[in-house]
C-alpha cells in the first residue's frame, strides 16, 4: 500500500519539482490516516522512557538507545536501535532527529522510515527541527565557542552561525511555527556570572537579533501563535516581542523567590 500511495502522491504533487522526502512525509500522513487504529494500551517495549515528543498524528518515544514511533491510534509505525551512547531527539511536525550527544552522527526520520543519516565534522550538542523540515544543529568548533548550522528540508546547508564566547553556547532552540525563524538561547559566563542571551535568527537573512539577556538558565521556550516568544527561566517567565522596532521583553512574571526545576509541555 505504501508503494501505491507513493506513486499517487508523485503524480498528484508533480513530484518532479518536489523532494522525495516531502513525498514520503505525505505518504506517511496517508498511511496513518488509512491504517486501522490498534487502540490502547500498547506495550511499546520501552520500560524507562527518557523523552517523548509529539508529531502530527503520532509521537516518538525514546528510552536508552531505542526509539519507537506510534500513531495516536496505537499503531506502531517505526522502531530504531541507534547504538548511540548519549542519544537525544528533537521533533517537528512530520519528522524528527535522533542524534548522538557523545558523537557526530544524526538521523533524520520520518514517522515510518529513515530519510537522511549525516555525519558532522565535530561533536553534536543540540538539535531542533522545524515543522517544514529544516534542521538546526549545534556542534563544537575550533574557530568559535560553538557552530550552529541550519539545513533545509533536503539536508542541504542553508546558513552557518559561528558564535563567539560573548554570544554564548546554545542551550535551547525553537523554530517559529512558520519555520522562517529560529529562537536561540545561548549561555555565556561574564565576570563569573552565568548569562543567557536570547536571539532570533531569520533564516532568510542569517543575521541574529538579540532580544535580551538574563542572569538565569532557561528551562523551556516556545513560540506563541501571535509571533511572541515565551521563555521560562529558573526565576521568572518572560514574554518577548520578536519583530519590528519594539523587539525585546514585553511582559514578565516573577516566581517570587521560587526556582523552576522542570517543565512539562503537554
Stretches found by the model and what they are:
Residues 15-19, 66-68, 104-108, 143-149, ...:
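Structural motif
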Residues 62, 99, 137-139, 185, ...:
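Residue-level marker for isolated small/hydroxyl-bearing positions within beta-strands
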Residues 30-44, 73-81, 112-119, 157-163, ...:
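A short beta-strand motif characteristic of beta-propeller blades
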Residues 68-123, 252, 259-266:
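Structured, soluble extracytoplasmic/luminal domains of envelope-associated proteins
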Residues 59, 96, 135-136, 179-182, ...:
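Hydrophobic beta-strand positions that form the internal "hydrophobic ladder"
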Residues 1-47:
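Sequence/structural signature of beta-propeller modules
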Residues 187-266:
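Extracytoplasmic/luminal low-complexity segments enriched in Pro/Gly and acidic/polar residues
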Residues 45-53, 82-94, 122-133, 167-175, ...:
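Repeated scaffold domains used in trafficking and secretory/extracellular systems
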